[in-house]
Amino acid sequence: MAPTLNAPEQIYADSKFGDTVFPPFSVDGKTITMTYNTFENRYEAETNHALRHQAAEVFYAELARHRHVTASAYNSRVQQEKIEATLRGYDSVFSFLLADQEVPRELYDRQIDVIMQDLAPIMQKYARLLQRVYGLSSMTSYDLKLELDPSFVSTISYTEAATYIKDGLSILGEDYVQMLSRAFDERWIDYAENVGKCTGAFCAEVYGVHPYILSSFNHRMDEVATLAHELGHAGQSVLTCSAQPYLNKEMSLYMVESPSTTNELIMENYLLQKAGDNKRERRWVLSQMLSKTYYHNFVTHLLEAAYQREVYRIVDRGGSVDADELSGIYRDVLTRFWGDAVEIKDGSTLTWMRQPHYYNGLYSYTYSAGLTVGTQMALRLMASSEVAGKADAASGKACGSKQNEVGQNDRSADENHVGVSDRQTVVHAWRSFLSAGGSLDPIAQAALVGVDITTDKPLKETIAYIGSIVDELVELS
């Protein structure tokens, strides 16, 4: 049955990678050729306004040519899920899809509703900052991927990226660094950028062997975070497969992005430390945290999740969807989130054609769910490392009793910090989380690291943290 049941996703992939070809176009007398990868990795954030907008128009015009077959494939998929939900006795397609994730409906709805309400004004503030920095007469949806500092150029070789990642993630333990070394040395990673190559970055788990990573390394410093992200999946895979039997190897979809996003944030905080007092470099790192890590997981995928929810509501009522209706739903979601801060271009309403995630049930919302736990964990790991570093420095100047006094002073100075003796405890808890695989449901798994996802507290704290990043970026700009 697999070829039949998987046909919608295969049709989507064949259309995207086999039939979607972008014609050359000219800007300022120069002929530009473009692929899916070069649009998403280069032209979408191009600082030349004319080139960026023309690339977007060409990109979405080509997507529009395939919108009906893509919509038909997607409608087939969601209808299939609804039929299966009914046959299995579920009261809704939501209950059916969330059962596999082992989370109640309220966690799913809360993730979407709270972010749409609380994060929207923060991101609108960021959009206005971009508009001011670039001197744009109007801020459009084609401008949202712009870098905050267009003249800050930071390139890195693949070998240098490997060194940065091993150094930055050393907080997770010596054997974790050894795993990272194996990934680079034994060529687990396909990093070359090639025509026809699948877009994005992915990690494939192979039980009993090792993971494989697909990426397109473009020698930009932000690729360090992307590689760290995928290596987060790889590290979780290695630890899970060594601790769990085959049937328990798969972590709930709700939690699957936590290991990856935690790695991203650890790396970005590592880069912040290296920036030191250099305000411009600090601004660049903070902008990467916002525009890459949080924008990707809390905005791009969350807006997709809000769109998906509307589609499944229609399907649950016995309806179906076509290309025009899908674009209309997406426009409404974009408009609700960005308000009057951003003009929504027609092409952006075709964003529903860009992701394969929709063929994997309620996947998109889990990026923000995973990053919520990831943020809480990364902050604790970084705090434990910082306090341990202070105590280690103090140990060279004081006797044992004085060391204890310093540790107590550090602990009382910041309630979020843990003492040096707790650093290993924090890391051990996180390693237990990574090793759990599918042996625990998400609520119990989050509890391993002291995060209670039955409340909105972790989510609201994460949104507040994002807000603090935007505030500092405004101050530094």
Predicted region positions:
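Active-site recognition of the HExxH zinc-binding catalytic motif
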Residues: 89, 218-238, 260, 370
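A metal-dependent hydrolase signature that marks the N-terminal structural subdomain at the beginning
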Residues: 93-94, 100-175, 409-411
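C-terminal, non-catalytic "cap/extension" segments appended to globular domains
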Residues: 139, 227, 235, 273, ...
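Catalytic zinc-binding patch centered on the HExxH motif and its immediate surroundings
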Residues: 154-156, 189-209
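Short pre-active-site segment immediately N-terminal to the catalytic Zn-binding motif
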Residues: 156, 208-227
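His/Asp/Glu-rich acidic catalytic environments and adjacent acidic regulatory segments
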Residues: 1-106, 110, 114, 167-168, ...
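Active-site metal-coordination segments of metallo-dependent hydrolases
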Residues: 247-259, 293-296, 323, 360-367
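Post-HExxH zinc-binding segment in Zn-dependent metallohydrolases
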Residues: 251-280, 296, 370
